[in-house]
Amino acid sequence: MLTVLAFRLAFPVMLVGMSMGCAYQLPSHPFQEDLTEPLVFGHIQVWQEEPSGRIYLPELASLEFSSREDQRRYRVEIEAASSYFFLSLKPGQYQVTRVFIQEGGFRSSAEVPLTFEVPDQGVVYLGGWRFQVDPPNYTRELEVTIVSESVKAIVELTVRYPSLSSTVVLSSLAEPSLLRARLFEVTPYPRFRYFNRHNST
């Protein structure tokens, strides 16, 4: 009886802990009917200038960010080397906490403290987020650059969401405009011979 009672008391606490620790999933391209204002959007591009021993080129698997007001965590699946994202969020300050890079079966993560603000209403362009990935090595890094390509971005917005064609779009780029972060590989590693964990140097 005591064991059952203890479980009943502990179970709600476990649920609360799990709900606080889990990130709320957001679509990167919501349906037209699901759009609400305020809306923020931007473009993500990932590339690697130096050659790599891996078959697959890097792409952004997902990014995580949190609200500074209520500490709620969000996760957006991107799964592309180049893609726009559109997010309907509550007004306030937000900070990106982590991004995940994927190369075939390999995954790595980096903490990138980008910040952005969501206004009380309207549509805001957050800029182009450029992720330059170092080739695989033991001290791999990621360079993030924030650029403005507002004309191209607004065209993409109006083509994808015609109902917003007459909406005034404000520009408020994420900050800082340049940062570097360490990339850490995420286990487990793929068990394929044609994958190279690091360059053979």
Model-based region annotation:
Residues 90-97:
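A short tyrosine-centered beta-strand micro-motif
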Residues 10-11, 30, 80, 109:
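Generic detector of short alpha-helix boundary/capping microenvironments
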Residues 1-22:
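Sec-dependent bacterial lipoprotein signal peptides
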Residues 81-88:
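Short, surface-exposed beta-strand/beta-hairpin micro-motifs centered on an aromatic residue
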Residues 22-68, 101-201:
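Primarily secretory-pathway and cell-envelope proteins
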Residues 70-81:
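Short, acidic Ser/Thr/Gly-rich low-complexity loop/linker segments typical of extracellular
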